Design a protein with these regions (language model features):
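Short, surface-exposed beta-strand/loop "edge" segments at domain boundaries and coil↔beta transitions
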Residues: 5, 30-34, 59-60, 102-107
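Canonical phosphoinositide-binding patch of PH/PH-like domains
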Residues: 100-122
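Charged phosphate-binding loop/patch that engages nucleotide di/tri-phosphates or the phosphate backbone
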Residues: 130-134
Length: 135
């Protein structure tokens, strides 16, 4: 999905009085052992998310194989217990731990083409202010 279309879609999902701080693409890579089991088809196991940060919470958009939004989840900042960030040059590993004891491990895009929404330093600093962050 193009960056501008995604921006419009995210803004329609924002609540009243909620401002968009930024959004980025993140992926859950396939498990390497699947490659030995099913071969190159294992690459289809990559799950892509667009994660948007707003004034009041985080929006998670799950994408299907053809790049269309399949699911939308919203979590206020107080529902996210911990955000763990690790260092990375091209991608930054993130782990969201929620208060309902679920967790989401993704790799956020840091560098790439201009058409891809990336995790910027400004957005990282904003998330550090809003959430309890472990680095």
């Amino acid at each position: 999905m193009k960056k501008m279309k995604l921006d419009e879609r995210i803004r329609t999902d924002l609540g009243p009085g909620e401002g968009l701080l930024g959004f980025f693409v993140a992926q859950i890579p396939f498990k390497f052992w699947w490659f030995f089991l099913v071969g190159p088809i294992a690459v289809l196991g990559i799950k892509t998310y667009y994660i948007a940060a707003s004034d009041k919470g985080m929006h998670f958009y799950g994408m299907n194989i053809v790049g269309q939004i399949e699911q939308h989840d919203y979590f206020p900042y107080d529902a996210i217990r911990v955000l763990e960030m690790k260092s990375g040059w091209m991608q930054m590993p993130l782990r969201f731990e929620f208060k309902n004891h679920n967790e989401l491990k993704v790799r956020a895009q840091r560098k790439g083409a201009k058409t891809v929404p990336k995790l910027t330093d400004d957005l990282i600093n904003t998330l550090k202010e809003k959430l309890k962050v472990r680095c």
